[in-house]
Amino acid sequence: MSERNNRKVLVGRVVSDKMDKTITVLVETYKKHPLYGKRVKYSKKYKAHDENNVAKVGDIVKIMETRPLSATKRFRLVEVVEKAVIV
């Protein structure tokens, strides 16, 4: 049961919500260059399961690792941290 507590939790921005019950989340991380010490930005996109289609493009969301839900989905939506500002 302790395995359940070791799941990855990531925070990112929704870049696509065109699929039904699926969102694409862009997660940006910073790593320090091993030799020069400069912080370098890395970004990766994850597909996440959004059961009720609550997340929209531009929202900041929290996703959690889960069992494989499809060929590419390995995460599910936990909560919408911040709604996007519509201009």
Swiss-Prot record:
**PROSITE patterns for the chain:** RIBOSOMAL_S17
Q: Spell out the Pfam families in the cross-references.
A: Ribosomal_S17
Regarding protein family, the annotation reads: Belongs to the universal ribosomal protein uS17 family.
Name the source's superkingdom.
Bacteria
Q: What is this protein called?
A: Small ribosomal subunit protein uS17
List the record's Gene Ontology CC terms alphabetically.
cytosolic small ribosomal subunit
* Organism annotation: Anoxybacillus flavithermus (strain DSM 21510 / WK1)
Q: Which Gene3D superfamilies match?
A: Nucleic acid-binding proteins
Q: Which GO terms describe its biological process?
A: translation
A single MF term (Gene Ontology)? structural constituent of ribosome
- Alphabetical list of NCBIfam families matching this protein: PRK05610.1, uS17_bact
Q: Which keywords belong to this entry? A: Ribonucleoprotein, Ribosomal protein, RNA-binding, rRNA-binding
- Give a short account of what the protein does: One of the primary rRNA binding proteins, it binds specifically to the 5'-end of 16S ribosomal RNA.
The protein's matches in PANTHER family, at most eight in alphabetical order, are given as: 40S RIBOSOMAL PROTEIN S11 FAMILY MEMBER, SMALL RIBOSOMAL SUBUNIT PROTEIN US17M
Assembly, per entry: Part of the 30S ribosomal subunit.
